[in-house]
Regions:
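Beta-strand-turn-beta hairpins that frame and shape the catalytic cleft
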Residues: 75-85, 131-135, 164
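Acidic, His/Gly-rich catalytic cores of divalent-metal-dependent hydrolytic chemistry
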Residues: 129-170
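A short secondary-structure junction signal
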Residues: 87-89, 95-100, 129-132, 148-151
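Divalent metal-coordination and catalytic microenvironments
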Residues: 12, 26, 67, 88, ...
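Active-site neighborhood of divalent metal-dependent phosphoester bond hydrolases
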Residues: 14-76, 80-83, 100-114
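Anionic-ligand binding region
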Residues: 101-129, 134-142
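N-terminal active-site segment of His-dependent metallophosphoesterases
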Residues: 1-18
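Active-site environment of divalent metal-dependent phosphoester hydrolases
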Residues: 1-3, 28-33, 94, 117-130, ...
């Protein structure tokens, strides 16, 4: 989403191939893919609500098949079996965000089955929160942070001795 969607996608695809970056589908990718459907209006109020996605689609039209194939989640198991799971929003939906004020009972449902580390990003607001035995991390956003800090935000996750270590980088 933004003026250089095609360039951004090219960069992360190149990093996927050269450095092993993992790519996931989020709600914006779904918006863009929906705009390419045969029943989408090209004018009127519905089009105007989705104009941003039509603009992005025009920039990434050569990568539509790649966007369709993106997985909804990624999991990495540590040497001792601790699971790191990454999704766009929650296990229920890529539009079901975890916020600082979300009650723990709700988070338990959003991350089930609970891994050692659950990584999300949909809300564009950085967050690290322990819920039972799970570290819940919202990595924020590189291009559109919603926490009044305009610096790019992303997460780094490394295996350290016997556990996952999480860091939000700004």
């Amino acid at each position: 989403r933004g003026p250089l969607s095609g360039d951004c996608l090219d960069l992360v695809v190149e990093r996927h191939h050269s450095q092993g970056w993992y790519l996931l589908r989020g709600n914006h990718e779904e918006f863009v893919l929906d705009c390419g459907g045969p029943d989408q209006p090209l004018s009127g109020p519905v089009f105007e609500m989705k104009r941003f996605a039509h603009f992005a689609l025009a920039q990434v039209v050569d990568h539509v098949d790649l966007l369709r194939r993106l997985p909804d989640e990624f999991e990495q198991e540590g040497p001792n079996g601790q699971l790191l799971r990454i999704v766009h929003a929650s296990m229920r939906s890529n539009r079901d965000g975890i916020y600082p004020m979300t009650p723990e009972e709700e988070i338990r449902r959003q991350i089930a089955p609970a891994p050692a580390v659950f990584v999300t990003g949909h809300t564009h607001r950085p967050l690290m929160r322990q819920v039972d035995d799970t570290l819940v991390v919202n990595i924020g956003s590189v291009g559109s942070p919603f926490d009044k800090d305009r610096r790019a935000g992303y997460g780094q996750f490394t295996w350290h001795r016997d556990h996952w270590q999480a860091e939000i980088v700004r």
